[in-house]
């Protein structure tokens, strides 16, 4: 489940740290979160799609590592990102 160009640009504009930012950790986590949510809805209807499930687990692991990095650098940025994306209950 890939993201369209317009959707990517919208995510970049929403989560960028400075005006020319396109690849900060916040932007990467936002893109991964969107892809994860799309893929999880796909898997609810396609239970036996094991290759997509494996890709989903890889994306979740990547997002977890990126969030750990953000948390180690700044607890404030981490909590703001978590609240903005609503990924922790």
From Swiss-Prot:
Q: Which InterPro entries match?
A: Ribosomal_uS15, Ribosomal_uS15_bac-type, uS15_NS1_RNA-bd_sf
Q: Which residues, by range, are in coiled-coil regions?
A: none
Which superkingdom?
Bacteria
- List the GO biological process terms: translation
User: Which Pfam families does the UniProt record give?
Assistant: Ribosomal_S15
Which SUPFAM superfamilies does the record associate with it? Answer: S15/NS1 RNA-binding domain (SSF47060)
**Keywords assigned by UniProt?**
Ribonucleoprotein, Ribosomal protein, RNA-binding, rRNA-binding
GO terms of molecular function: rRNA binding; structural constituent of ribosome
NCBIfam families tied to this protein: S15_bact
Which HAMAP family does the record associate with it?
Ribosomal_uS15_B
State whether it acts alone or in a complex, and with which partners, per the record. Answer: Part of the 30S ribosomal subunit. Forms a bridge to the 50S subunit in the 70S ribosome, contacting the 23S rRNA.
**What job does the chain carry out?**
One of the primary rRNA binding proteins, it binds directly to 16S rRNA where it helps nucleate assembly of the platform of the 30S subunit by binding and bridging several RNA helices of the 16S rRNA.
Family, per the entry?
Belongs to the universal ribosomal protein uS15 family.
Q: What is this protein called?
A: Small ribosomal subunit protein uS15
Q: Which organism is it from?
A: Prochlorococcus marinus (strain NATL1A)
């Amino acid at each position: 489940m890939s993201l369209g160009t317009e959707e990517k640009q919208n995510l970049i504009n929403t989560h960028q740290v400075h005006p020319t930012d396109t690849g900060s950790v916040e932007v990467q986590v936002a893109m991964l979160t969107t892809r994860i949510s799309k893929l999880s809805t796909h898997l609810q209807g396609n239970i036996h799609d094991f290759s997509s499930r494996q890709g989903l687990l890889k994306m979740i692991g990547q997002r977890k590592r990126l969030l750990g990095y953000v948390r180690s650098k700044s607890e404030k940025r981490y909590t703001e990102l978590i609240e903005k994306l609503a990924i922790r209950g």
